[in-house]
């Protein structure tokens, strides 16, 4: 039987899809807005909304379940502390998808997926390692 085996494969193996959704959900939680293709955004939406629902319920078991899906401790802390508090009175619908035209290189439809009532300052936070002046002088 094929029950509950739907969803897009996105031309990837199951391990690649899992890793991609982990990375995309961590980026979405960190920046609260990301740009991707429409198909990936539509598949990412239920993945992230289930994580927010786990965070709203709280508790150690739900934190461990979310960690097994997210695999990023910093974003797990933000999910359970910031986002759970922000959406405590909202029953679902934590994200929105805005279609943003087509990509110039391959004409793929592009979309912006973002949290509703997002923090405008979160977008564009530094993602890479921080180098100090001392490290630059030593190099």
From Swiss-Prot:
A GO CC term assigned to this protein in UniProt: cytosolic large ribosomal subunit
SUPFAM superfamilies found in the cross-reference section: Prokaryotic ribosomal protein L17
Pfam family, one: Ribosomal_L17
Gene Ontology molecular functions: structural constituent of ribosome
Subunit relationships: Part of the 50S ribosomal subunit. Contacts protein L32.
Family: Belongs to the bacterial ribosomal protein bL17 family.
UniProt protein name: Large ribosomal subunit protein bL17
Organism: Sphingopyxis alaskensis (strain DSM 13593 / LMG 18877 / RB2256)
Gene behind this protein: rplQ
